[in-house]
């Protein structure tokens, strides 16, 4: 099932010659190549998103995949698994922020196909460095500190590549929580445009 926040799950009933068939709303949207990331990012969420992208690639390797993102972020390694798959699959990956894309959510937003990274007008985007903590013997703390530093450098380097910002600016801006409006995110290079109210029903059509 597409990944979204828990709560009542609407169903859609379709009629055919073989009778009525009910779909949960996210499965129905998956048929339109729309995926939702509406939770924090962990291994289970990453597995679900990766599986959906691979399925949609197998269905049609030339048609865009759309990922709607409303996520506070989460596990860096799980997020990188999603990111690597976004870069690997043949279809272009359209990313659309609705609500909030923070931390790993913002990173995934920026990792969509260039020219196809979008945000709704009242969305918020926040970037910062990876969070982590360690306890135990000094050698264990040192190992964890090195890993956090490695992940920070990896994420900053990739974000610099996707935004066009200098690496030192990315490092400085992500030292603390850094919030942006959609217009500011366009200027920063995190996204490419803000979705207007064109009455297209929320489906981002291919240009």
From Swiss-Prot:
InterPro entries: ClpP, ClpP/crotonase-like_dom_sf, ClpP/TepA, ClpP_His_AS. Its EC number is 3.4.21.92. It holds the Pfam family CLP_protease. Coiled coil: none annotated. It comes from the Bacteria. It catalyses: Hydrolysis of proteins to small peptides in the presence of ATP and magnesium. alpha-casein is the usual test substrate. In the absence of ATP, only oligopeptides shorter than five residues are hydrolyzed (such as succinyl-Leu-Tyr-|-NHMec, and Leu-Tyr-Leu-|-Tyr-Trp, in which cleavage of the -Tyr-|-Leu- and -Tyr-|-Trp bonds also occurs). One of its GO terms (cellular component) is cytoplasm. One of its GO terms (molecular function) is ATPase binding. Transmembrane segments: none annotated. The keyword Transcription does not apply. Gene3D superfamilies: 2-enoyl-CoA Hydratase, Chain A, domain 1 (3.90.226.10). Belongs to the peptidase S14 family. Fourteen ClpP subunits assemble into 2 heptameric rings which stack back to back to give a disk-like structure with a central cavity, resembling the structure of eukaryotic proteasomes. This is ATP-dependent Clp protease proteolytic subunit 1.
């Amino acid at each position: 099932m597409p990944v979204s926040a828990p709560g009542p799950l609407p169903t859609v009933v379709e009629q055919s010659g073989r009778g009525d068939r009910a779909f949960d709303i996210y499965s129905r949207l998956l048929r339109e190549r729309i995926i939702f990331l509406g939770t924090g990012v962990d291994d289970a969420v990453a597995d679900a998103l990766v599986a959906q992208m691979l399925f949609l690639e197998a269905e049609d390797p030339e048609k865009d995949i759309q990922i709607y993102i409303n996520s506070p972020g989460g596990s860096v390694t799980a997020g990188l698994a999603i990111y690597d798959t976004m870069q690997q699959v043949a279809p272009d990956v359209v990313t659309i922020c609705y609500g909030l894309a923070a931390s790993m959510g913002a990173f995934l937003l920026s990792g969509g196909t260039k020219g196809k990274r979008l945000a709704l007008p009242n969305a918020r985007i926040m970037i910062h460095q990876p969070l982590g903590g360690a306890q135990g013997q000094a050698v264990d703390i040192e190992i964890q500190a090195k890993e956090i530093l490695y992940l920070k450098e990896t994420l900053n380097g990739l974000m610099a590549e996707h935004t066009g910002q200098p690496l030192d600016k990315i490092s400085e801006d992500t030292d603390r929580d850094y919030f942006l409006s959609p217009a500011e995110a366009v200027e920063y290079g995190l996204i490419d445009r803000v979705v207007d109210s064109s009455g297209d029903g929320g489906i981002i059509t291919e240009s």
